[in-house]
Curated annotation (Swiss-Prot):
It holds the Pfam family PseudoU_synth_1. One of its GO terms (biological process) is tRNA pseudouridine synthesis. InterPro entries: PsdUridine_synth_cat_dom_sf, PsdUridine_synth_TruA, PsdUridine_synth_TruA_a/b_dom, PsdUridine_synth_TruA_C, TruA/RsuA/RluB/E/F_N. The keyword Isomerase applies. The keyword tRNA processing applies. This is tRNA pseudouridine synthase A. CDD domains: PseudoU_synth_EcTruA (cd02570). Formation of pseudouridine at positions 38, 39 and 40 in the anticodon stem and loop of transfer RNAs. The gene is truA. The lineage of its organism: Bacteria, Bacillati, Bacillota, Bacilli, Bacillales. Belongs to the tRNA pseudouridine synthase TruA family. Keywords: Isomerase, tRNA processing.
Amino acid sequence: MRRFKCTIQYDGTDYSGYQVQPNGLTIQEVLEKTLGRMHKHPVKVIGSGRTDARVHAQGQVIHFDTELSIAPASMVKALNTLLPDDIRVRDCKEVASDFEARYDVVGKEYRYFVRRTENAFRRHQSVLIPYSLDVAQIRLGLAHLVGTHDFSSFCVAKTETDNRVRTIYEAELIEQGEELIFRFQGSGFLYNQIRIMVGTLLDVGRGRFAPDDIKRMLEAKDRNVAGVTAPPHGLYLWEVFYPESKKGI
């Protein structure tokens, strides 16, 4: 038995998230059904983490076991032939049998896209902001999020873990034409953390909060003091990081 690690991208518009669930089509379900067709038996797919309904991925990582005598490059071609067009396999590598797509993760990068003008072709991939934003103020607020903090104010109350301390290594706002891209790289993120941080930073940009309010929100450890949760369709799981020893055979 061999273990394959695949990097996949998907448009989450028509899916109820990544993880298999009773109601609604999911990315994991489609992947497992496709691999099942290839193998003629059920194949379990493990992902680096969940993404919610309508959230996209540029670099989700999965692993699965196979007894097929097939090269990784051929696996990419076979899967992309069978998968729907909104799910693509970007890369596939054979890895050691102890590689875990979920538990070996050492960091992740997320990006959130907003646009300042109407664009029919980007309506499901970025969020329209119909009001003016002060980009300089947003960047000042963004700087307060870098570092190790308790992010209780920036996650939903039902977050499963009691430990809400996370480290953000890098955070920046990129201007790209009519779009603004929030980029966050960190050790890991809490449920809805990116969307709440972005929603709050957009409120900074429109003057509802001052940049220094971000620091006070972190200290408060209270979800009620932060801003709204930004919509899901602007969010992308961009890249997942692993130790060098887990990169592949």
